[in-house]
Amino acid sequence: MASNNNSGISTLYTLHNLHKQQRSMNTSIERISSGKRINHAGDDAAGGAIASRMTAQIKGLDMSVRNASDTISLAQVAEGALDESAKVLQRIRELAIQASSDLYSGEEKLYMQTEANQLIQELDRVAKDTKYNEIAVLDGTFADRRFQIGNQEREAVTLSVGNLRTDKIGVHQVRTDATAGSDYTNLATAALRGTTNTIADEDFTIHGHLGQTTINVEANDTAKDIEGKINNKFDTTGVSATSSTNLKIQGLRTDATGSATLSLTLFGKNTTGRTISAGVTLAQNSVSTNDTDLSDLRDKINAYSAETGIVATLTATKDTVYLTNDEGYDIKLQDLDFADVGDAETHKLQVTGMDARLFDSTGAERLSGSAVNMFDKSFDNSNTQAAGYADSVIVSGQITMSASQSFTATTDYGDGDDGLFESSPGNATLTSVSTISLRTRSDALSSLKVVDRAMDQIHMERAKLGAVMSRMGQAIDNLTNVSTNTSHARSRIEDADMAAESSMLTKSQILQQSAMAMIAQASRIQQNVLTLFQ
């Protein structure tokens, strides 16, 4: 065996292994101290890129969780304000109910109106001043706001909160025969609607905030029938309906002064007519003096109110009687007879309704419109009916469609046709909370519907905000779950296996020590060659 000393091969091999163990030990020390398997791109190029992408995703998810939490905070601020607004509206509603009672004087109702006005101002203040991070949320400007709750561009939620100022909330309404008033006090301005009050076949479509539907009106439907058809579709459209029938009897005049008897058969919701025979005091050729007294007619009609659904009221001058059926049944006055007064030769009686149809004793239609004269002919003293004498009149009702949100109603009838509407109804008209009046019983009752629909709007917005809060809570849970699992996946890629690295470090340390010892041995071997020269 040759003894070569010049190259020092054993020492070179030992140094090479020492350097390898030194690098391995340094890597293990770096991984153990940092906790990461990948500290440089060279440690794992592909793994490093994947881990970096996952880190960006995790940070985006964590920020999305914060965004969702902030969205919940915003919704809580708005919902709390709406809760207070609902309480204010409830108080206004209490005042409206109180003011609708005739137990209070006009001055006392003025006090109620004063409180209502202050509450309305408070509602406006809440709508204007409710803000989150100086962003108003209830004044109508908070529309289509986007909240980023995901790691990607399109992962956002859109939220809009309606305008809850008092001039923007209330009841949206469309009335049939829209040119006429809503109650009997406005009947004098009612417009003609064709040749008959018998409703013709007609389709009209309601476009509500929940959806749209088409209502088929059949010939001879009463206002109550149509009301029922509309309300049956409430869940589809969000639009409800009420109906009422109003009739005014006035213009009782004669060319003589004295007492007479007015008789008729009355139909409302009853199918069997009720005969009314009332004494009437008349002023000669006058409809405006206090000498004309229809009190007995009012009392006789009201005696059957429970059966007919018709309530009669009398004006202060006692010369006009209003008949109202709040359920929308047609009001029919049949077999009308007016006994002569002394030697009177003329009598006159006028009936005013939203849609009145007049018949003579043979059943033939004589006249239709909003104001028809029952008697306007000359008579002799034999109580014989003249040719123009009317035997019966039918008055149909008015339908009011209402919703808390704006809606439209369209009909297949044109302007002037014999349909539900004098003209195309178009968009609903808003009666807002800001216009509430409690000064009269009628105003207070109307205010109830306004407040109720305004509360519906408040409830709708609260429901939207509650839904957003619930959704954000679920989003936070999901985002947290995704972030956690992604972090776990990243950990498996870039985190160091501490047990394995500790073992590797121990191994490297032992091998390093062994290499150092072997270098010493290799040096001695080379020194042994020198003994050959001694």
Predicted regions: what they are:
Residues 1-534:
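Primary detection of the long, small/polar-rich alpha-helical "axial" segments characteristic
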